[in-house]
Amino acid sequence: MAQHDYRELAAVFAGGALGSLARAALSALAAGDPASWPWPTFTVNIVGAFLVGYFTTRLLERLPTSSYRRPLLGTGFCGGLTTFSTMQVETLTMLEHHHWGLAAGYTLTSIAAGLLAVHLATKLVRRVRVRR
């Protein structure tokens, strides 16, 4: 069995708690309706994708190695903020209510916008000069 660094696990836990709280706060602002676009979930997933792209590129390419930054910010915060499972439940609910176009549009737009967000964040980090 592999040894775990409990400080790294604590970083994931702390980041996950903060990300989950941020998502819950945003979700509380708007109630779900299967006939409308689920903006809270869409927003946190796209923002989370951007942040994962930003943090991953910045931490791997621009900052000194730290064993706690990636678990705290990437796995923890962004993992807690984003919610693929809620997106799936919302899509299924749309399908159950016969909102076929909305379900297809939501799924395709979520995937495309998420990929674009990661790409843009990566380009942004790589465009900024590194101070030495």
From Swiss-Prot:
Na(+) binds at residues 79, 82. It catalyses: fluoride(in) = fluoride(out). Keywords: Cell membrane, Ion channel, Ion transport, Membrane, Metal-binding, Sodium, Transmembrane, Transmembrane helix, Transport. It is found in: Cell membrane. It is a multi-pass membrane protein. Na(+) is not transported, but it plays an essential structural role and its presence is essential for fluoride channel function. GO terms for molecular function: fluoride channel activity; metal ion binding. GO terms for biological process: cellular detoxification of fluoride. InterPro entries: FluC (IPR003691). GO terms for cellular component: plasma membrane. The chain crosses the membrane at residues 9-29, 35-55, 72-89, 100-120. Fluoride-specific ion channel. Important for reducing fluoride concentration in the cell, thus reducing its toxicity. Belongs to the fluoride channel Fluc/FEX (TC 1.A.43) family. This is Fluoride-specific ion channel FluC 1.
